[in-house]
């Protein structure tokens, strides 16, 4: 699986937050993404991979250097739906990037 395929898979999970929820994480979609990430970490050789009750994913990669932590959140804004996302991939060739009715200009 290449990096584009991975990211397209990640955005398929409905991970928007639920501001009314008192649990952590606030939605089942966030737990599901965490579980998928844990499986990927195992598949690429990390050990002691686990997802705790709050959805945090941990793994260990043996090495000789100092420890390094990579931290990111898995939730997205509750302002828009996280369901039925239809990502668009564009091979960027420089210049202005058209985004529907708007543009992204370097």
Predicted regions and their residues:
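Solvent-exposed, charged interface segments at domain starts and junctions
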Residues: 1-2, 106
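N-terminal capping segment at the start of a domain
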Residues: 2-28
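Sequence-level detector for tyrosine residue identity
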Residues: 10-13, 56-60, 92
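Structural signal for hydrophobic packing residues in well-ordered secondary-structure cores
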Residues: 11, 15-18, 41, 45, ...
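Active-site metal-coordination/substrate-binding segment of hydrolases
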Residues: 66-106
């Amino acid at each position: 699986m290449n990096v584009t395929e991975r990211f397209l898979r990640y955005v398929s999970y409905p991970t928007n937050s639920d501001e009314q929820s008192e649990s952590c994480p606030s939605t089942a979609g966030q737990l599901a993404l965490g579980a998928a990430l844990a499986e990927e970490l195992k598949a690429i050789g990390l050990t002691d991979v686990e997802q705790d009750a709050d959805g945090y994913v941990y793994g260990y990669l043996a090495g000789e250097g100092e420890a390094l932590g990579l931290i990111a959140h898995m939730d997205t804004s509750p302002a828009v739906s996280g369901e039925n996302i239809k990502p668009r991939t564009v091979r960027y060739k420089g210049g202005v990037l058209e985004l529907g009715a708007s543009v992204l200009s370097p």
